[in-house]
């Protein structure tokens, strides 16, 4: 060692056994988390709030999707085509009603012609009447945020403003004068689905990007503040891989605690928001949580680059 000529402050740091690389896995990282309780609480709270925002938006997006197009998704399914009249411009259920000739073509392709109409019940509540052809779903479905009342085709046709669309198998031949839509394109025929989902999904993606930047900034500041301790660890023989493991492990602990708390908060809050169309499920909580964990680790990983390039002598003298 250099105890005979090193400056006193460096000798004191080198004599501090808590900084040696032989104290166990993530010793220094855990010690810093405990020693900086204020900073630890701040970044965990930040992760918690970001997680809550993302999971709440994901749950809201899924809930709005169900109220916008669940009936259409039920009718079309995953391996069938939605058939609408090609009226030019943007195709939707309101503008793409089939003609009688096109409806007969759909039936000739072993397809189903669905009749629908907007109406109101005796209490003045709006609903959409839709022909069920004797096959009603077990749960209440919606279209464009209005509940579906299943009726026979004859009953729906008696209502004013009725329109029709077709459903055929995915291998059916094209029908002249129509457009055939599948998957997300079919759901976009709902007037409310496309606008809601595109805006909400954009917000969620932006939150993922923002979370990576915010967490990266937090960990960058945190990392720069611990450069001297890292330099001493390197000077005492600590390997760069152990330093990397320690830093990533530290970030992982913070992220897991914050993301878990944010996810649990969303699950708890979602149970009380009965008037808001939210679908709190594993798909809307665990998947966003996993993406946030990866985004946070990416931001933390980028912040560790200066640590891996640190010169022990320069860092200790700074």
Could you describe each region identified by the protein language model?
Residues 252-297, 301-318:
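Short helix-loop junctions at transmembrane helix boundaries
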Residues 43-53, 197-217, 254-258, 262, ...:
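Alpha-helical transmembrane segments of integral membrane proteins
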Residues 80-83, 136-192:
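A short beta-strand structural signal in non-transmembrane regions
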Residues 70-128:
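Membrane-proximal extracellular/periplasmic loop immediately following the first transmembrane helix
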Residues 39-41, 52-80:
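Alpha-helical transmembrane segments
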Residues 176-213, 220-228, 233, 248, ...:
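Peri-transmembrane interface segments
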Residues 1-41, 303-318:
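Feature of multi-pass inner-membrane transport and sensor proteins
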């Amino acid at each position: 060692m250099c105890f005979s000529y090193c400056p006193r402050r460096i000798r004191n740091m080198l004599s501090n056994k808590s900084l040696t690389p032989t104290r166990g896995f993530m010793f220094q990282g855990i010690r810093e988390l405990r020693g900086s309780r204020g900073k630890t609480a701040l970044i965990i709270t930040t992760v918690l709030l970001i997680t809550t925002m993302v999971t709440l938006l994901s749950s809201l997006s899924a809930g709005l999707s169900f109220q916008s197009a669940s009936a259409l998704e039920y009718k079309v399914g995953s391996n069938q085509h939605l058939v609408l009249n090609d009226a030019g411009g943007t195709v939707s259920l309101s503008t793409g009603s089939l003609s009688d000739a096109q409806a007969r073509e759909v039936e000739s392709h072993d397809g189903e012609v669905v009749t629908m109409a907007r109406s109101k019940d005796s209490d003045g509540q709006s609903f959409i009447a839709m022909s069920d052809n004797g096959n009603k779903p077990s749960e209440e479905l919606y279209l464009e945020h209005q509940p579906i009342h299943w009726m026979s085709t004859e009953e729906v046709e008696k209502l004013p403003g009725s329109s029709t669309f077709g459903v055929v198998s995915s291998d059916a031949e094209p029908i002249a004068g129509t457009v055939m839509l599948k998957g997300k394109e079919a759901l976009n025929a709902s007037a409310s689905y496309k606008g809601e989902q595109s805006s909400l999904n954009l917000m969620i993606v932006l939150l993922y990007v923002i979370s990576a930047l915010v967490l990266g900034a937090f960990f960058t500041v945190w990392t720069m503040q611990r450069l001297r301790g890292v330099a001493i660890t390197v000077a005492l023989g600590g390997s760069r891989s152990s330093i990397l493991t320690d830093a990533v492990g530290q970030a992982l602990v913070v992220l897991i605690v914050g993301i878990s708390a944010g996810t649990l908060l969303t699950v708890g809050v979602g149970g009380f928001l009965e008037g808001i169309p939210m679908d709190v499920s594993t798909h809307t909580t665990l998947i966003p949580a996993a993406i946030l964990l990866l985004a946070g680790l990416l931001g933390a990983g980028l912040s560790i680059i200066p640590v891996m390039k640190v010169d022990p002598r320069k860092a200790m003298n700074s």
